[in-house]
């Protein structure tokens, strides 16, 4: 299934229907590529965050990590999936949380972990998520988003960013 953001219609392709490959690339694939570029791959100008990072921080500010409490990274990932309707794999979400904990990835990193979240040499070499605990860093309040700047949509009957 692909979506076309211009008219917000979902186009279903039946597997039994023959489609010309040039027509498919010119219409469906191009709309998918532009959707990924606009909504997932590039950081937004409003806050400099990609969608995954924004959803993680949104979950922490909605109450998942209030008052300096500490949580297992897997629990924060579950809260993010629940509160922000994160529909992609949990491994990419775990990697995104570990990236937000890395002091070398952000000038003011929003989350803190006292475990191994990667290094400059290998930023993806974080410890297993079940061993990592995370909490909001002292810079977390700097990352609170001005919600008037964001576009909200309805997904599964819930309003999400």
Give, region by region, the residue ranges found by the protein language model:
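Catalytic phosphate-handling regions of large nucleic-acid enzymes and associated NTPases
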Residues: 1-161
């Amino acid at each position: 299934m692909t979506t076309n953001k211009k008219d917000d219609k979902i186009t279903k392709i039946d597997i039994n229907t023959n489609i010309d490959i040039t027509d498919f690339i010119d219409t469906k694939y191009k709309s998918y590529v532009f959707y990924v570029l606009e909504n997932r791959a590039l950081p937004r100008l409003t806050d400099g965050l990609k969608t995954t990072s924004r959803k993680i921080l949104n979950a922490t500010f909605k109450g998942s990590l209030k008052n300096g409490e500490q949580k297992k990274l897997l629990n924060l990932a579950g809260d993010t999936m629940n509160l922000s309707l994160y529909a992609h794999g949990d491994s990419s979400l775990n990697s995104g949380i570990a990236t937000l904990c890395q002091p070398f990835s952000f000038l003011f990193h929003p989350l803190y972990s006292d475990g191994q979240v990667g290094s400059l040499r290998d930023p993806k070499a974080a410890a297993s998520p079940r061993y990592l605990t995370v909490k909001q860093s002292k810079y977390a309040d700097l990352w609170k988003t001005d919600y008037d700047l964001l576009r909200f949509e309805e997904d599964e009957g819930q309003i999400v960013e």
